[in-house]
């Protein structure tokens, strides 16, 4: 992250204020302030993670994934007696915090800030699947989008989607 001296001074002052406003995270802010003031290039790259960017297309794909899971859950709940699919199979797990943090952050934003998909269980890890899920979800989306009645799936269609 390239910054002018003026930008670094402004950001340093912001971290100083945040230390006063949020003492619980004061140590983190003081560390970031030191990095900015001294211009430690390697550590300044950490700031890039705080200012990520998701394209509109990627955001729509994440929403499509969550909508697919909503459809799976609705379809499962509408199934007749005798047809059973384990609820855990249609539970949205989220994304891997280590490798898919941008997607995970967007999911948390949608649920916690925007109030969407609040019926999804965040679990104890807050939608951190702890394993990469993007490719799996892409395969599932292709199967789901090919279904003629996406919100009235039969047991066979549900199984095809979750096994994709």
UniProtKB/Swiss-Prot annotation:
InterPro entries: UPF0304_YfbU (IPR005587), YfbU_alpha-helical_sf (IPR023146), YfbU_helix-hairpin_sf (IPR023145). Belongs to the UPF0304 family. NCBIfam families: PRK05445.1. It comes from Cronobacter sakazakii (strain ATCC BAA-894) (Enterobacter sakazakii). This is UPF0304 protein ESA_00925. HAMAP family: UPF0304. SUPFAM superfamilies: YfbU-like.
């Amino acid at each position: 992250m390239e910054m002018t001296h003026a930008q670094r001074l402004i950001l340093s002052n912001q971290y100083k204020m945040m230390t006063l406003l949020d003492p619980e995270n004061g140590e983190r802010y003081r560390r970031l302030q030191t990095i900015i003031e001294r211009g430690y290039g390697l550590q300044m790259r950490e700031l890039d993670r705080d200012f990520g960017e998701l394209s509109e297309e990627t955001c729509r794909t994440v929403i499509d994934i969550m909508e697919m899971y909503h459809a799976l859950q609705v379809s499962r709940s509408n199934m007749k007696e005798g047809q059973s699919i384990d609820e855990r199979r249609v539970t949205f797990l989220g994304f891997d915090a280590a490798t898919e943090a941008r997607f995970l952050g967007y999911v948390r934003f949608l649920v916690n800030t925007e109030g969407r998909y609040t019926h999804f269980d965040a679990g104890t890890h807050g939608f951190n699947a702890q394993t990469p899920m993007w490719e799996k979800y892409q395969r599932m989306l292709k199967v789901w989008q090919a279904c003629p009645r996406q919100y009235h799936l039969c047991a066979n269609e549900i199984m095809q989607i979750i096994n994709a």
